[in-house]
Amino acid sequence: VPDPTVHTTRHTVDVNAPVDAVYPIIADVTRWPYTFAPTVHVDLLDRDDDGPQQRERLRLWATANGVVRSWISRRTLTPAEGRITFRQEVSAAPVASMGGEWLLEQLDGGTRVVLLHDYSVVDDDPDAAAWVARAVEHNSTAELAALRAAAESADDGTLLSFADEVYVAAPAPEVYDFLYHADRWRERLPHVARVELTEDEPGVQILEMDTVAPDDSVHTTRSVRVCFPTDRIVYKQTVLPPLLAAHTGTWTLRPERDGVVATSHHTVVLRPDRVGALLGDSATLADARDLVRRSLGTNSRRTLEQARRHLQPVAD
């Protein structure tokens, strides 16, 4: 059997920020879902610090040509060299193998980032090779543009994280079931005007819904949800309200007393260029932060409070 064809790609971008500002964005996988558009979620499975190098094992969920894929990768980080190598341990068809490298070079006043990939496809199928080539091209270009934007706008106040929690006197599986079955939210949640839910792969959902905000405006959102029975659901919005550049979230359930503390976590990146047009010429980024915190927090609390009413009707 001949060796499979190995395809290679090289993508570069120059960033107007020092290596010390760029490298941590690539190194910290918890930042990827709200930084890189294709990345839905990353779980850090294992980490080993070994002197000048760190080794990690990750499971990633990401979109490729509009389809959600998941795989396990190993990474070796060498900060002193501005280098991060990666190799998929378990790939998702039609990818048979994939690896690569991030290389960062300090320039006068900035950083050159090089992203290398090498990959093969199942059975050397030419249609599969073309599909993977499109995905690598699209995702690499998008990730480098997002990396540049994130590094050049660091600490500008556009990143916002917050959480709301509600105690529910019900078993965790029942609360999880309420959050998991978003297809029933139209009947259960007054702030949801329309909902469509698909789950072609167990535990990976596509959720589209129209949500009524506190000011009675209606926003259409589309999210990829990754479900971990029976204590966690993570999601990333792929169709966003106009004020947001990114929005990720997590529903978590923590046992307490005879029930659970249900928490809704949000991380958003605001679009400062839209603030004036959407909120008025005198509106500030602080106004936008307050509005987003209030709107998302209100809807999250409504969802959790409705779960509480649904699951413990006698208490209410």
Where do the language-model regions lie?
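Generic structural detector for well-ordered beta-strands
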Residues: 12-14, 76, 103, 165-167, ...
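Transmembrane beta-barrel architecture of outer membranes
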Residues: 161-163, 220, 248
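Hydrophobic ligand-binding cavity/cleft-lining segments
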Residues: 1-53, 133, 141-201
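Glycine-rich portal/gate segments that line the openings of hydrophobic small-molecule binding cavities
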Residues: 2-4, 30-34, 43-94, 183-187, ...
